Amino acid sequence: MTIKLHHLRPAPGAKTEKTRVGRGEGSKGKTAGRGTKGTKARKNVPAAFEGGQMPLHMRLPKLKGFTNPFRTEYQVVNVGDIARLFPEGGQVTVEDLVAKGAVRKNQLVKVLGDGDLTVAVQVTVDKFTGSAKEKIAAAGGTATEL
């Protein structure tokens, strides 16, 4: 007779049922394998418990200060970027900057003063730094805030 898959059985003693402890004196009752007294005999200890030593989360310093929930964030464009994106000069609005891929739409835009500007541009955005206004004016352009 050939042996088939359904003839196979686990070896005797290989599979034993789980022992249910604490269910009567005759079968691992009373202390249920925990020994007598002590912390481990009673409920359980928290995962972060370090045996009475000052725990790590209390040893580390707290973060100082706070984050202002009303802070306004601007997308920044430098004067040098405007000179590179608009070499012929002319009108520059937030929509033009979005079309050129310099900023994302529906966001506030601020022009910073890094770089040089040689052509006259009429820039209309949400905010300017002082140096950006000076460089735009020096090149013969205008800086208008929305």
Curated annotation (Swiss-Prot):
Q: Does the keyword Ribosomal protein apply?
A: yes
List the coiled-coil residues: none
Please give the Gene3D superfamilies that the UniProt record associates with this protein.
3.100.10.10
Query: What does the entry give for GO biological process?
Result: translation
Q: Which keywords belong to this entry?
A: Ribonucleoprotein, Ribosomal protein, RNA-binding, rRNA-binding
One GO MF annotation is: rRNA binding
Question: Where are the annotated segments for Disordered?
Answer: 1-46
Q: Which InterPro entries match?
A: Ribosomal_uL15 (IPR030878), Ribosomal_uL15/eL18 (IPR021131), Ribosomal_uL15/eL18_sf (IPR036227), Ribosomal_uL15_bac-type (IPR005749), Ribosomal_uL15_CS (IPR001196)
A single Pfam family it belongs to is: Ribosomal_L27A
What GO cellular component is one of the record's annotations? cytosolic large ribosomal subunit
Where on the tree of life does the source sit, at the highest rank? Bacteria
Of which family is this protein a member? Belongs to the universal ribosomal protein uL15 family.
Q: How does it assemble?
A: Part of the 50S ribosomal subunit.
HAMAP family assigned to the protein according to its UniProt record, in alphabetical order: Ribosomal_uL15 (MF_01341)
Q: What is this protein called?
A: Large ribosomal subunit protein uL15
Question: Which source organism does the UniProt entry give?
Answer: Rhodococcus opacus (strain B4)
- Gene expressing this chain: rplO
